[in-house]
């Protein structure tokens, strides 16, 4: 099936156009070391053979303790603002960001979940169906890093095993420097490996690494979506081409008599 999808609404902004595969933050804890899109994905994009990928919203869930800066991170990327007046998220909120990846329209639905214990039962209902789970912590507070284990466990419980990309993100990078930053990142990289997650350090205040991080998230999710769609197309072709007859609604059922070959000889 060839795709003739066009973006819904106005063209995406230039900083949402991804032509090449975004690089990882550190090779010591990354989900994909390749520097290019998967060959099948590149070929499908060139042929515009990406099925319905351009019409779907891929769900991204951001979890973590109160005050780690989840909302600030999302607002810096989606609105390019940094609000110094903190307001806790009540329940859940979300933003939709549109991209153009390898010439194909693609959208992320980014869910901002509350960090307060009293909202956990509400937020957990929105973990389901996530393609990406971002576990955020404060680089200046080691306790928030330790808590990411539980946040990730809660989010994974609502999704099928192996179905989600996992990112561990250290926020407030602008508040650390030198040896303190190196130690905090080393601890985080160690945990990211345990989680089978990709690690990033960012600053919502300065914007450092924020765009690069979300571009990486979008590219990995897009690549997976295209590969899954190609697999579905392949499975559909196999089912149609396996030699079985397709019974049309209203047509008479086939009998053993009708299956016999007709004799066309003279009597």
From Swiss-Prot:
GO function term, MF aspect, one: GTPase activity
Positions of the UniProt region annotated as Disordered: 243-267
Record's bilayer topology term: Lipid-anchor
Alphabetized InterPro entries for the sequence: P-loop_NTPase, Rab, Small_GTP-bd, Small_GTPase
EC number of the protein: 3.6.5.2
Gene3D superfamilies: P-loop containing nucleotide triphosphate hydrolases
Tissue/organ expression: Ubiquitously present in all tissues examined.
Primary location group: Golgi
GO CC terms, sorted: Golgi apparatus; Golgi membrane
Record PROSITE patterns: RAB (PS51419)
Broad EC category: hydrolase
GO biological process: protein transport; vesicle-mediated transport
Transmembrane helix found in the keyword field: no
Cofactor: Mg(2+)
Lipid-anchored residues (S-geranylgeranyl cysteine): 266-267
Record function comment: The small GTPases Rab are key regulators of intracellular membrane trafficking, from the formation of transport vesicles to their fusion with membranes. Rabs cycle between an inactive GDP-bound form and an active GTP-bound form that is able to recruit to membranes different sets of downstream effectors directly responsible for vesicle formation, movement, tethering and fusion.
Family, similarity comment: Belongs to the small GTPase superfamily. Rab family.
Record remark on domains: Switch 1, switch 2 and the interswitch regions are characteristic of Rab GTPases and mediate the interactions with Rab downstream effectors. The switch regions undergo conformational changes upon nucleotide binding which drives interaction with specific sets of effector proteins, with most effectors only binding to GTP-bound Rab.
Protein name: Ras-related protein Rab-36
Organism whose genome encodes this protein: Homo sapiens
């Amino acid at each position: 099936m060839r795709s003739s999808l066009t973006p819904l609404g106005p063209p995406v902004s230039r900083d949402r156009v991804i032509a090449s595969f975004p690089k990882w933050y550190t090779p010591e804890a990354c989900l994909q070391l390749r520097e290019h899109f998967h060959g099948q994905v590149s070929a499908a994009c060139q042929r515009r053979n990406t099925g319905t990928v351009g019409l779907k919203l891929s769900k991204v869930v951001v979890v973590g303790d109160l005050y780690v800066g989840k909302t600030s991170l999302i607002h810096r990327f989606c609105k390019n603002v940094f609000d110094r007046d903190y307001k806790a998220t009540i329940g859940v909120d979300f933003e939709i960001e549109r991209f153009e990846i390898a010439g194909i329209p693609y959208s992320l639905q980014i869910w901002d979940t509350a960090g307060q214990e009293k909202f956990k039962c509400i937020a957990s209902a929105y973990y389901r169906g996530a393609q990406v789970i971002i576990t955020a912590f404060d680089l200046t507070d080691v306790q928030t890093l330790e808590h990411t284990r539980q946040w990730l466990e809660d989010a994974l419980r609502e999704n099928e095993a192996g179905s989600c990309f996992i990112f561990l993100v250290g926020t407030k990078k602008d508040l650390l420097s030198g040896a303190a930053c190196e130690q905090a990142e080393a601890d985080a990289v160690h945990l990211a490996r345990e989680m089978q997650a990709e690690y990033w350090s960012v600053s919502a205040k300065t914007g450092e690494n924020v765009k690069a991080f979300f571009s990486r998230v979008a590219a990995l999710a897009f690549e997976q979506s295209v590969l899954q769609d190609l697999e579905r197309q392949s499975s559909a072709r196999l089912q149609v081409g396996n030699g079985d007859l397709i019974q049309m609604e209203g047509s008479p059922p086939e009998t053993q008599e009708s299956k016999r070959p007709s004799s066309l000889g003279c009597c």
